Amino acid sequence: MEIYKEVGKPAEVVKRFQIAKMKGTHGIGHTRMATESAVTTLGAHPFSTGEDQCLVHNGSLSNHNSLRRELIRKEMTFETENDSEVAASFITYRMNSGRTLKEALESALVELDGFYTFVVGTENGFGVLRDPIACKPAVLAETPDYVAFGSEYRALTSLPKIEKAKVWEPEPATVYFWGH
């Protein structure tokens, strides 16, 4: 898994890292509107806190400080004050404890307070989870060739054959996973 993080407009970042030339089974990108931490490369998404795992997050966690302290006691480390890094570390800790990505995301529903949509990538695919009240917008598009996720439909409109895609809003408190 390769992680590319940068501050800037999406088109500039795509060009700088030559994203269009990359090959692989899946990719996760994120355009961030910072609400709780500085706009820096370190604070940019995705957050990777475990081997072959990364997370992007739209939302805000109200219990991230207490969860951070709990995870530090369990020997997890942090580089930022970002609540998204706490969410990524939470998922990593659960997966390192033997849980699957699905099980780790299901435990997030119980232990994380706030409103959120997570997209988590692993070497085997990616998962999506929305909080129990589906506070943050989310839309998925599926075709035989790809699965795409965005906060808004307009983020997906330039995808190939989007007009033939099954486009839908993921349910609250439901884990979705696509593998390869």
Language-model region placement:
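Conserved short alpha-helical segments that host acidic/polar catalytic motifs at enzyme active sites
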Residues: 1-180
